[in-house]
């Protein structure tokens, strides 16, 4: 928002256990969408409308669950239905326990997403929420922003840019 981007945040129901959607609504000035069938908006097919507006999608933090759903073509919530409808660049930042991140199934799903054009940002190494230390930490927000700016090839000026953050 500070860079004049129109930022929309989508969350899974599970993500609301970690942070309240109101936080993102306050920061972006846009409704944070969780429920695919939320009726508190002017009628439109919301996930398709958002997908058409987005210039870039940043999936951060991306859980093993979300990665698996998208890699498997599962679209069963606001986040996954919107991502499936997007034709813009998609950037994904996995964040999870090291053992989960290194699991061959998760690695195969990330390779599959790369094959389909997703850019995967390697997780940071450090102290994780579970108490372990290792790869799996979400990269710093400044690094995520660098990836977005690189994609849109604009230095600090995001005026008119539509960014979808999940």
Predicted segments, located by residue:
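A cross-family phosphate/adenosyl-ligand binding-site feature
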Residues: 1-90, 97-166
């Amino acid at each position: 928002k500070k860079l004049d981007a129109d930022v929309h945040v989508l969350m899974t129901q599970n993500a609301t256990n970690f942070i309240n959607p109101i936080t993102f609504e306050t920061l972006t000035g846009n409704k944070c969408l969780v429920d695919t069938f939320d009726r508190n908006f002017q009628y439109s097919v919301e996930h398709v409308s958002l997908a058409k507006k987005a210039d870039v999608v940043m999936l951060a933090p991306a859980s093993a669950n979300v990665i698996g759903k998208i890699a498997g073509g599962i679209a069963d919530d606001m986040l996954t239905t919107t991502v499936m409808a997007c034709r813009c660049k998609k950037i994904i930042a996995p964040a999870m326990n090291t053992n989960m991140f290194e699991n061959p199934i998760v690695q195969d799903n990330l390779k599959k997403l790369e094959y389909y054009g997703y850019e995967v940002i390697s997780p940071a190494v450090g102290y994780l929420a579970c108490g372990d230390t290792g790869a799996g930490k979400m990269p710093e927000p400044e690094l995520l922003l660098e990836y977005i700016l690189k994609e849109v090839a604009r230095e600090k000026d995001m005026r008119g840019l539509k960014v979808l953050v999940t």
